[in-house]
Every structure is written in C-alpha cells, then in structure tokens.
UniProtKB/Swiss-Prot annotation:
Source organism of the structure: Aspergillus oryzae (strain ATCC 42149 / RIB 40)
Keyword flag Transmembrane helix: yes
The protein's name: Protein pbn1
GO cellular component, as recorded: endoplasmic reticulum membrane; glycosylphosphatidylinositol-mannosyltransferase I complex
GO biological process: GPI anchor biosynthetic process
Subcellular location: Endoplasmic reticulum membrane
Keyword Glycoprotein: yes
Glycosylation sites: N409
InterPro entries xref list: Pbn1, PIG-X/PBN1
GO molecular function: mannosyltransferase activity
Ranges annotated as spanning the membrane: 504-524
Pathway field: Glycolipid biosynthesis; glycosylphosphatidylinositol-anchor biosynthesis
Gene name of the encoded protein: pbn1
Length: 543
C-alpha cells in the first residue's frame, strides 16, 4: 500500500517549521490548519478475493461520495458532485452482463448499504443508466452510471476494517475510521494500472488543527509521502500556483522544498538543502480544469410550497455569482447546472428541450443540453427499475443592459411520480442539490494535462470538451438535500374505505361508459341496417 497525505493551507494561514518534525521513522505534525486529502493505493494482490474478483470484471470503476453537509472545496480540490453515492462503471468484454452486474451490485450493497436500488437483472440497463457522451474525445467517461443518497459511510468503514485492513495494522484501521468524518471519498480502479485507489477529503481541520504522527510502514516496503502545501494567485488564468514542503517518511532525513517540474507521486521534484537554513519554498504552476471562485459566489436551492405533484426547483444566486469567472480573455463562458434526480422526481424532457423563447425566458433557462435515465411521464415509482435521471441545463444570466437584481432566480419545473400509499397520506421524497458551475473554453494551445490533483469521472465534466475549465459555485445551506412532502393515497381506516369506494366508483363509471358506447354503436348498426330494407320496400310499392 502506498499513501499520499496532502495538507493545503490558505495563503493567510500561519505556519512554522516546528509544526512538522521529521524523524527517521515518522513525521510529527502539530496544529496544522488547512484542508487534508489522504490517498491510499492498493495493488490487486493486496485486496481480498471477493473484491479482486469483481474488479477483474471492470474495465474501469469509479465511486464518488459527497457528504450531505456543506463543505469548502478549496483549490486544488475545487470540483463537486451532488450529495450521495455515485458509481461510474465500464465492464470488460467477454463475460455476461448478468454476472458482471450481479457481483458488482452485491459488492456495492456489502460495502455501502444493503438498501441500494441495485438489482441483479439480465442487463445493466435495468439498474444503471447510460450517460450521454457529448464529447467523444473525453475517453475516460464510463459506460454506465448509478446514484443513491447515502448519508453516512459507516458500512464502508466496517468493510475496510474487516476485509482490507489486518487487525495489527493500526494505521490502516485509523485511516478507515477517519473516513466517517470525510467530506468526500473517491474510489478508482482501472484495468490498465491494476490498482485500487481510495481518496478521502476533509475541508476543515479539527478545532486545534491536524495533530498526527505519520509513521513509516513497519515492514518498510510501503511508501508514505506527505506534503504541506499552500496556494497563491497564479500568473495565467488557467493555472494553479502552489508551493510548500515534502517528505517521504522513513526515507528522507529532512523536509524538502518544492522545485519546478512535475515528476513523482505529488507531481513535483525534490530539492534538498545543503544546510539547515530554510529559504522560501519555490512555487510551481500547472493547468487545472477545476478552478476556485470567491467565497461569495454562492447559490441556494428551494422548492415552492406546497409542492404538490408538480414542484418547481428554484436556484437562487446573488450578483457575485453572476460575474464572469477569471477565465482567459478569449474564453467563452456559460453558467450550467447538473441535476441528479432520484426516481421519485423527474423532468419533462419535451418541455425542457423546447426552443420557445417565452418559456425559456420565464424560467431564466437557455437550453437543455443532455438528459439520461428515467424520463417516463406516466410510470409510478414502483414501476421504475433504475435509480433516476441526470439533466444538464444551461442557465441564463442578466444581460449587460439589465439591472442585476439582488437575487437572480432560475426555475426548473419538475414532476413527482405516484408513490405508494401511506397511513398519513404523505410520503417524503429526498432531492439532492444539483451542482452549479461556469464552463469556459480554455485558450487555444493550452495543454490541460492530468495534474496530481486532477479529478475526472464526475458525471458532468465528460459532457464538455477536454479544454473546458470549470468554476464551481459554492452551496450556501448547511444541508444539501431537500425533503419534499408528497401527497399519496391514505391507508388508515377512513382512507382505506375511501380508496375502495373510489376504486368501486371508478369501475362503475367505466362499466356504464362502456355500456353506453356499445349501446350507441348498436343503435348505429341497427339504424344503418334498417334503412336499406325501408328503401327496398318503398321501391316495391312504387312498382
């Protein structure tokens, strides 16, 4: 197992060298204030058999989990996904789809939640959706996609502790337990590297900062890299500038300054000093697809009340969110939102894909660019086998001639499916917040290569070209899931009687209507049959 631990401090955060003390066996940290990313990489041989068997059926498997709590996505960890569990999967060729999905669904349920809406049907399409690929050049986009709300990662922690960590590996057990407090977790596997990578991200340090002793592995075979980094304003708009200190625990005898260049696990070269004096760390820059925005670039989500069966999602943004991002001068930018909707709620793709300017202007929409998943307008929720749908919408912004209001509202009309009856006459439907971002075309000639912190397979970034830069708006609420109260058929004594009466009344009306139609058809047939007879009788009398 290889570990990479990165601390990123804000430019104004103080730091002194006595907060990081490197010894031959460990790095002792004290009161580090900043975001933390921890990455563990396992070879397939290190994994339990039940996990490696499933991975061997995957060409690529990417899991993204984001907390329902609001958190800061600081550079270079600026990208976001909607709250919950996201799975992006491409199977290998050569084995049946039923076996692939059966083993994958079973693994997802054991590792995350046995209540996941992931069955083992005959085809992948009955549980996973197929995302649209608008940018064919973005080859890393997975073939199938899945989502489910998942408030906690308690099951994943237990799975790692019991299946991956040995009982004597205290560092592995401690890392697994720390996942409970993570703001986001990524899991990646591809058949080329044959390695599984688990990344956890914590946007805030504990009350007294990060205090930890990061020790080298007892066997001395597993590498542990630690970076203490900071960000500064970059010269080029597509770049992120960073600098700081590095150490390989158990190998280096002092913290190393960063120098320019991007080799190694961190993407930087090592530069050792010849004495104990410390100069300012050398800064380095690299192009990044995901860029930060100021803290006041926020958005909020709400639904009109009462929601009924046709709720309207409102995305509200202050004027600071409508300012064009600091993209290259020749870049073209547009504001977008990417909705991840569970099966209980959906949009009307025919309505949202309209080009009617009156409809679009009334909702401050520009266009629906992509939709995938369940869009059946009539099916109740219990008839829908797949998890839900995704929607990519371009949002309108005030023109330069318009006076910018204190709050710019974008409205998206949605629809709720019929849910199963309940005793109260209502059921709850949970809707995760969408992500809202600016998408800007990068300058011609910009090499958007993979940087050490790059994050791909988020679902929405694969719908754009490879030279697109993204600027994420920050959600403003403490909880990023909306709870809707959905009216359903009531199942208490009175409601049950009423439901039976309604069913009986409906059957009577249908029966009477059918008899009336048959009676009318019979009358028409009888009258059309008697007319020729009357004509022939009259003709005989005249003769």
């Amino acid at each position: 197992m290889r570990r990479r631990i990165t601390f990123v401090q804000r430019p104004e955060t103080p730091f002194s060298l006595d907060q990081a003390v490197l010894t031959p066996d460990a790095l002792a940290l004290h009161g580090i204030d900043g975001a933390r990313e921890e990455r563990a990489t396992f070879s397939v041989d290190e994994l339990p058999e039940e996990l490696s068997d499933v991975l061997k059926q995957c060409h690529q498997l990417h899991v993204r989990w984001a907390s329902e709590r609001r958190y800061d996505a600081v550079a270079p960890f600026s990208s976001r996904v909607s709250p919950g569990l996201h799975v992006f999967y491409t199977p290998v060729d050569g084995s049946s789809e039923e076996n692939k999905l059966k083993s994958l669904c079973a693994l997802l349920k054991r590792a995350f939640d046995y209540g996941l809406k992931c069955k083992s049907p005959e085809t992948l399409e009955e549980s996973f959706i197929t995302p649209p690929i608008l940018s064919t050049r973005f080859a890393s986009t997975a073939a199938f996609q899945y989502h489910s709300l998942l408030p906690t990662l308690d099951n994943l922690v237990a799975y790692i502790e019991n299946k991956i960590c040995s009982s004597s590996d205290e560092q592995c057990l401690r890392y697994a337990a720390s996942i409970r407090s993570a703001d986001s977790v990524d899991i990646n596997y591809d058949s080329i590297s044959h390695s599984l990578t688990v990344l956890g991200y914590w946007s805030q340090s504990p009350k007294n900062g990060w205090t930890d002793e990061i020790r080298r592995h007892a066997a001395g075979t597993d590498q542990v890299e630690v970076g203490l980094l900071g960000t500064e304003a970059a010269t080029e708009p597509e770049d992120i500038k960073m600098g700081g200190l590095l150490a390989v625990v158990g190998k280096d005898d002092q913290l190393s300054m960063l120098s320019s260049g991007l080799p190694s696990e961190f993407g930087v070269a090592y530069g050792y000093g010849t004495d104990d004096s410390w100069a300012e760390p050398t800064l380095f820059s690299f192009p990044s697809r995901h860029q930060p925005l100021p803290e006041d670039a926020t958005y909020s989500i709400s639904f009109t009340s009462p929601t009924g069966l046709h709720p309207t999602m409102t995305i509200s943004m202050p004027p600071s969110s409508l300012n064009s991002p600091p993209a290259p001068p020749d870049a073209t930018c547009a504001l977008h939102t990417y909705l991840t909707l569970p099966s209980t709620i959906f949009g009307d793709k025919y309505q949202l894909s309209t080009t009617d300017p009156l409809f679009l202007d009334s909702h401050n929409l520009v266009a629906l660019h992509a939709v995938a998943g369940e869009t059946d307008l009539e099916a109740p929720d219990w008839f829908v086998s797949r998890w839900g749908s995704n929607w990519l919408l371009e949002l309108a912004t005030p023109s330069e001639s318009d006076q910018v209001p204190e709050e710019w509202n974008v409205t998206i009309p949605l629809h709720l499916r019929y849910l199963r009856p309940s005793e109260s006459g209502y059921r709850s439907a949970s809707v995760p917040w969408p992500v809202v971002f600016w998408a800007c075309t990068a300058e011609d000639g910009t090499k958007m290569g993979v940087n050490p912190f790059d994050r791909v397979n988020l679902g929405w970034e694969g719908l754009f070209g490879t030279r697109t830069m993204f600027y994420q708006l920050h959600p403003s609420s403490d909880r990023l899931v909306e709870e809707l109260e959905v009216p359903v058929l009531q199942l208490d004594d009175k409601g049950f009687f009423q439901s039976k009466a309604i069913e009986l009344g409906t059957m009577i009306v249908i029966g009477l209507g059918s008899l009336w139609v048959l009676w009318k058809l019979g009358a028409i047939a009888w009258s059309s049959g008697t007319r020729p007879q009357r004509k022939s009788t009259k003709q005989k009398k005249s003769e």
